[in-house]
Amino acid sequence: MESSFGLLLALLTLTIIHIVQAQDPQGFISLDCGLPANETSPYTETQTGLLFSSDATFIQSGKTGRVQANQESKFLKPYRTLRYFPEGVRNCYNLSVFKERKYLIAASFLYGNYDGHNIAPVFDLYLGPNLWAKIDLQDVNGTGEEILHIPTSNSLQICLVQTGETTPLISSLELRPMRTGSYTTVSGSLKTYRRLYFKKSGSRLRYSKDVYDRSWFPRFMDEWTQISTALGVINTNIYQPPEDALKNAATPTDASAPLTFKWNSEKLDVQYYFYAHYAEIQDLQANDTREFNILLNGQNLSVTGPEVPDKLSIKTFQSSSPISCNGWACNFQLIRTKRSTLPPLLNALEVYTVIQFPRSETDESDVVAMKNISASYGLSRINWQGDPCFPQQLRWDALDCTNRNISQPPRITSLNLSSSRLNGTIAAAIQSITQLETLDLSYNNLTGEVPEFLGKMKSLSVINLSGNNLNGSIPQALRKKRLKLYLEGNPRLIKPPKKEFPVAIVTLVVFVTVIVVLFLVFRKKMSTIVKGLRLPPRTSMVDVTFSNKKSKRFTYSEVVQVTKNFQRVLGKGGFGMVYHGTVKGSEQVAVKVLSQSSTQGSKEFKAEVDLLLRVHHTNLVSLVGYCCEGDYLALVYEFLPNGDLKQHLSGKGGNSIINWSIRLRIALEAALGLEYLHIGCTPPMVHRDVKTANILLDENFKAKLADFGLSRSFQGEGESQESTTIAGTLGYLDPECYHSGRLGEKSDVYSFGIVLLEMITNQPVINQTSGDSHITQWVGFQMNRGDILEIMDPNLRKDYNINSAWRALELAMSCAYPSSSKRPSMSQVIHELKECIACENTGISKNRSLEYQEMNVSLDTTAVPMAR
């Protein structure tokens, strides 16, 4: 282990040296991606004076390339080479940064037909576990992405993800630390949309003109007049725009007209932040006044009063909160006030769009532990790059993770390094994965003793150390711990002695076992004989009896009278028709009448009546009475005037589309009803047919579970039992229950997860137009893209809290997890739904959209890479 520590220390020292080499005195990180090993690194880029270094020590994979020779002269040196990634789906740069410090991060991409195929690559760019942008290199001059972002850990991972047949590539990667307190947001990061200064002719301004190496592009329009000064302009506010940009300004040629910028958004409700920099650079006469207001689509943004420029000194208007154009067209204007004698002026303008990164990075201590484990064993796996847990489809192999709350860091719960050719002792770094539940190190060449720390890991429930060369004794702490411990195939390991039982006790146990087996066999045979003597269940139903004799029992003629001869149909189900009725003159009821052709019979009828007679909960439909007369069976229960949830989600029958807040409340109320069945009943019950059509709504849209014909009891919390028949509705049915026949409360949890996905997306559970794909498949695909707007029901018109939506979506997917052991209980579901509602009620991030692609608008300027 000392040698491993020495190697790790040497690697750490080497990394620090390379980080220092990649930084200049301003703390900049400038990487020339794909710089050949035979070229000098670091080198000074002649036009900017910036120090660029090779990217080789910041990434584990990729190959180097160079743009075609006939294109090299058009581009600066850092953009002539590139790194491309023919292997692996995700390839990531790992950069050391300061946690909670704001950085300007710029990534540049230039294809340059380096491979001679003349096929422009298309791929995704990720920041940690979140999608940053979609890269399409159709432009021969390349493209760039720039963002202002605050890392949540001391490690920043920038990843290129293959999405099709083409190969991802990158030309340069640059990080610039920004001044504390600048470019603040309510939430999210800022993606650069435009950064302009106003001059009729000019070149791109960046370092050393701009101390933060921001790129400023000249812009001017025919209806403007340029004013300039040769004097110095003080630019030392928190944003510190370049002085060269402030020595010129634009004013409208028509002094009474506004100074106007127009563009069209590619998406509705994009959120913007504006930073307008202005300084008075004209000599004003004694009676001259210049003041103006800043407006967006007619909304006055100068809420503290008109903007008044200072003589040769910068002022900056900044958005205090995100602003939307509320449509496709955006109209940003500076309008003079009535008392102003001069038109408005503007020296420079920055426009950013908000981009949300909702997914938290994997817990930092878990990530460090995995890196240390990898270093200890010399593991080199192509997919062990980027965030270990998310996106889910890119999760590191050998790992399982859990993440009940999207805003909290995911945790690693399972590590499987079986048959990985591991040598040495069991790595001490494993103990740093504090929520690890399963550890499999079997069939390697591990030596040494079983470490004491394994017995102190509270979450560990399964340890497999089979097939190694471990020695020594098993630690006392591990022997006392109640877990599954596999140690076979370790011949040098001293196993604890087996406890010997007295012969008399063994004999007694064997005798009792034989007696029990004989009794069970006898009882099964008797049950078979009795069952053979029973009459078919549908020959007559007059024998149906119920445990509760106090309920109202209707005659068939009373049912006819209550329903006015079955005049008004409310719906139809597997049981039969449901009719509207009235009892006691004014009390409205719903009457479910068993159809003679129904696939359900007296057994389901009796089950529903028995359950409704003994359960009483505000979120379960109440039974008024029943009819059992000859072959006529009917249930009479309370009438819920707003019908079922499915109708309202679809908008069928003129039903209104319910908003997001009400949907969350309905979900919570349905969950409360299920929780009562699971833990409030004796014995506990499972519903077995949870779906949107079985969630009914009263006049106040209060939710109540209905249709208990398939409900069954089970032994208790966390347990399951075999079900002789598989029942439920296709798409909502727990696949694990379907395959195993095991019935438990987690079967209802799965169905509830599907219901919640329906409420979130308004997508069909089974999409028959897409090869019968399931809703979980569609949602999983969209989640991996990171765009919540593509997932949410468009009928909601984006009127929801982004964080609340993400939390609900994560909860739904955890409920619908294939393995029932990984699903939450209904009590946990209720807790999470309450958190979602609380998050929604805060109003934070309301109407916040996600913007990934740079807009192609009339203010067009070329992003880096930049031609000479």
Curated annotation (Swiss-Prot):
Its main location: membrane. Its EC number is 2.7.10.1, 2.7.11.1. The modification Phosphoserine is found at S723. The active site is at D689. The keyword Kinase applies. Autophosphorylated on Tyr and Thr residues. Residues 23-500 are extracellular. GO terms for cellular component: plasma membrane. The modification Phosphotyrosine is found at Y637. Residues 564-834 form the Protein kinase domain. Residues 522-868 are cytoplasmic. Probable receptor with a dual specificity kinase activity acting on both serine/threonine- and tyrosine-containing substrates. This is Receptor-like protein kinase At5g59670. It comes from Arabidopsis thaliana (Mouse-ear cress). The lineage of its organism: Eukaryota, Viridiplantae, Streptophyta, Embryophyta, Tracheophyta.
